[in-house]
Protein backbone atom coordinates (compact mmCIF):
# COMPACT_ATOMS: atom_id res chain seq x y z
CA UNK A 1 0.00 0.00 0.00
CA UNK A 2 1.17 3.52 -0.77
CA UNK A 3 2.04 5.17 2.57
CA UNK A 4 3.42 8.38 1.08
CA UNK A 5 1.15 11.44 1.06
CA UNK A 6 0.41 12.90 -2.39
CA UNK A 7 -0.60 16.47 -3.15
CA UNK A 8 -3.17 17.15 -5.85
CA UNK A 9 -4.81 20.33 -7.13
CA UNK A 10 -8.53 20.49 -7.97
CA UNK A 11 -8.91 21.10 -11.71
CA UNK A 12 -12.69 20.87 -12.04
CA UNK A 13 -15.67 20.41 -9.73
CA UNK A 14 -17.88 17.80 -11.41
CA UNK A 15 -20.92 17.79 -9.12
CA UNK A 16 -22.40 16.64 -5.84
CA UNK A 17 -23.11 13.05 -4.91
CA UNK A 18 -24.16 11.02 -1.90
CA UNK A 19 -27.62 10.37 -0.53
CA UNK A 20 -27.96 13.97 0.71
CA UNK A 21 -25.42 15.68 -1.54
CA UNK A 22 -22.77 15.84 1.17
CA UNK A 23 -19.91 14.69 -1.11
CA UNK A 24 -18.43 16.63 -4.03
CA UNK A 25 -16.91 14.81 -6.98
CA UNK A 26 -13.81 16.56 -8.34
CA UNK A 27 -11.15 15.98 -11.00
CA UNK A 28 -7.64 16.39 -9.55
CA UNK A 29 -4.17 16.67 -11.06
CA UNK A 30 -1.14 15.48 -9.09
CA UNK A 31 1.51 18.11 -8.41
CA UNK A 32 4.42 15.68 -8.88
CA UNK A 33 2.99 14.04 -12.05
CA UNK A 34 1.42 16.69 -14.29
CA UNK A 35 -0.02 14.19 -16.82
CA UNK A 36 -2.15 12.23 -14.36
CA UNK A 37 -5.80 13.22 -13.78
CA UNK A 38 -8.19 11.20 -11.60
CA UNK A 39 -11.67 11.65 -10.13
CA UNK A 40 -12.06 11.77 -6.34
CA UNK A 41 -14.91 12.22 -3.89
CA UNK A 42 -14.31 15.01 -1.36
CA UNK A 43 -16.27 15.63 1.83
CA UNK A 44 -16.48 19.25 2.89
CA UNK A 45 -16.14 22.57 1.08
CA UNK A 46 -13.95 22.49 -2.04
CA UNK A 47 -13.45 24.72 -5.08
CA UNK A 48 -11.19 24.84 -8.14
CA UNK A 49 -7.56 25.54 -7.32
CA UNK A 50 -7.67 23.94 -3.86
CA UNK A 51 -4.80 21.61 -2.96
CA UNK A 52 -5.82 18.26 -1.48
CA UNK A 53 -3.66 15.91 0.58
CA UNK A 54 -4.39 12.37 -0.59
CA UNK A 55 -3.42 9.52 1.71
CA UNK A 56 -4.31 6.98 -0.97
CA UNK A 57 -3.55 8.09 -4.53
CA UNK A 58 -4.53 4.97 -6.50
CA UNK A 59 -8.24 4.96 -5.67
CA UNK A 60 -10.50 6.61 -8.23
CA UNK A 61 -14.19 7.48 -7.78
CA UNK A 62 -16.92 6.15 -10.04
CA UNK A 63 -18.46 8.68 -12.40
CA UNK A 64 -21.73 10.44 -11.59
CA UNK A 65 -24.85 9.26 -13.40
From Swiss-Prot:
Record key words, sorted: Cytoplasm, Ribonucleoprotein, Ribosomal protein
Keyword Cytoplasm: yes
Gene3D superfamilies xref list: Nucleic acid-binding proteins
One MF term in the entry's GO annotations: structural constituent of ribosome
This protein's encoding gene: RPS28
Name recorded for this polypeptide: Small ribosomal subunit protein eS28
Entry GO terms, CC: cytosolic small ribosomal subunit
Keyword Ligase among record annotations: no
GO biological process, any: translation
Organism of derivation: Zea mays (Maize)
Annotated HAMAP family: Ribosomal_eS28
Family membership noted in the UniProt record: Belongs to the eukaryotic ribosomal protein eS28 family.
Cell location: Cytoplasm
Superkingdom assignment: Eukaryota
PANTHER family xref list: 40S RIBOSOMAL PROTEIN S28, SMALL RIBOSOMAL SUBUNIT PROTEIN ES28
Signal peptide span: none
Principal place of residence: cytoplasm
PROSITE patterns with a match to the protein in the record: RIBOSOMAL_S28E
Amino acid sequence: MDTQVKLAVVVKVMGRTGSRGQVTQVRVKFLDDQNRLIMRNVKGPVCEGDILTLLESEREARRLR
